[in-house]
Amino acid sequence: MNITSKKKYLAFDFGASNGRAIVGKYDGAKLELEEISRFDNKPVFVGGTLYWDVLRLFLELKVGIVKAKTKYKDISSLGLDTWGCDFGLLAKDKRLLSNPIQIELKTLLLL
């Protein structure tokens, strides 16, 4: 692969308090990383429980994709990383049943 044909990959990292979109450019020998967007990940507190604001995160995902595709027309793939200790429940038809619950302070204290 020559220097003019770098492959580009879009990655999203959704952390406990913020997230970001990063484009990785790889020429076969060297990987360069460029942050495309960064955003807050603030939970929604309802009835004593912290929930992920999945609609806001979905919006930020779309914003990051648009920004990356505007700058780089030839993105090869997309990857997404989130906290592994939180989860969402899906119905049989694959609809999200409710916003995923963030790990709670009382749960953390038990660990």
Q: What are the roles of these predicted feature ranges?
A:
Residues 104-111:
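Glycine-rich phosphate-binding loop plus the immediately following alpha-helix
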Residues 101:
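Surface "functional belts" at beta-alpha junctions
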Residues 1-98:
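N-terminal glycine/serine-rich phosphate-binding loop of ATP-dependent small-molecule kinases
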